[in-house]
From Swiss-Prot:
Alphabetized InterPro entries for the sequence: ARFGAP/RecO, DNA_rep/recomb_RecO_N, NA-bd_OB-fold, RecO, RecO_C
SUPFAM superfamilies: ArfGap/RecO-like zinc finger, Nucleic acid-binding proteins
GO BP field: DNA recombination; double-strand break repair
Similarity annotation: Belongs to the RecO family.
Cross-referenced HAMAP family: RecO
Organism: Rhizobium rhizogenes (strain K84 / ATCC BAA-868) (Agrobacterium radiobacter)
Keyword match DNA damage: yes
Full protein name: DNA repair protein RecO
Entry function: Involved in DNA repair and RecF pathway recombination.
Pfam families named among the record's database cross-references: RecO_C, RecO_N
Source superkingdom: Bacteria
Length: 259
């Protein structure tokens, strides 16, 4: 059996003295593993870095076998991704999110989103918002998508301010006010129909929102912890926002975001 596809490197594991098992995210075949012979060679090590885009050919005798990868570089961006803390942690955290999905299960939307985010991860001001939207997309692909398009109580699409922790649906400010202390805040930049950019406060609220539902629907039922790289990314992203906020008195810095 054989197929060919574009793939993004997620990670590698050493196998013997010269080979590695590579983990990649492909567009048409999802997250996939394969043996790379001579993967530890001087020529292949720069190619097999997380975040790089490659053209991969997979061969195996049977579909269920691990199989062997042959790789050709398409876009080597790992060196650039290592220049900022947000990018370093972001690549690791997004890889951990993709490992929540079944292996070899196609998720073309997530592949495309990952590729776009990696191209823009070097800008810390964009990285936080893109990462939050990626977490929302993963929740949706796992069957736990949030409905942020209209108020669950009234059906209106304006002034959406809360998210119900029970249903994952948006609630407008008027309808949610009596239960505001029990609701999750809906950051304005995530509300349907808005074009507002994220700032420190709204970004911290967004991390709390996605973290809550990831923990409730995914990590807690599976008995696993949220990847440490996520917290590293959050701190790096908020630090970058805080640095910009020092020059903008109307945007007070935000110190941390907790689940």
């Amino acid at each position: 059996m054989q197929w060919q596809d574009h793939a993004i490197i997620l990670g590698v594991k050493r196998l013997g003295e010269t080979s590695v098992i590579a983990e990649v995210m492909t567009r048409d075949r999802g997250r996939h593993m394969g043996l790379v012979r001579s993967g530890r060679s001087r020529s292949m090590q720069p190619v097999l870095q997380p975040g790089n885009l490659v053209e991969v050919t997979w061969r195996a005798r049977l579909h269920e076998h691990l199989g062997e990868f042959r790789m050709e570089p398409v876009r080597l961006r790992a060196a650039r991704l290592m220049e900022t803390a947000t990018a370093v942690y972001g690549v690791q955290a997004m890889g951990a999110l993709l490992r929540l999905l079944p292996e070899r299960d196609p998720h073309p939307y997530l592949y495309d989103a990952l590729d776009v985010i990696l191209e823009n991860m070097q800008n810390p001001m964009d990285a936080g918002e893109l990462f939050v939207r990626f977490e929302l997309a993963v929740l949706n692909e796992l069957g736990y998508g949030l409905d942020l398009g209209e108020c669950a109580a009234t059906g209106v699409r304006d002034d959406l301010a809360f998210v119900s922790p029970k249903t994952g649906r948006a609630v407008c400010r008027t309808a949610g006010a009596p239960w505001a202390d029990k609701m999750l805040a809906l950051p304005p930049f995530l509300a349907a129909g808005t074009v507002e950019a994220a700032n420190g406060e709204s970004l911290a609220a967004a991390f709390r929102l996605t973290g809550f539902f990831l923990h409730r629907h995914v990590y807690e039922p599976r008995g696993i912890e949220i990847a440490a790289a996520r917290e590293g990314f959050i701190q790096a992203a908020l630090k970058a926002v805080n640095a910009v906020s020092l020059d903008r008195p109307d945007n007070p810095p935000v110190i941390a975001a907790k689940r």
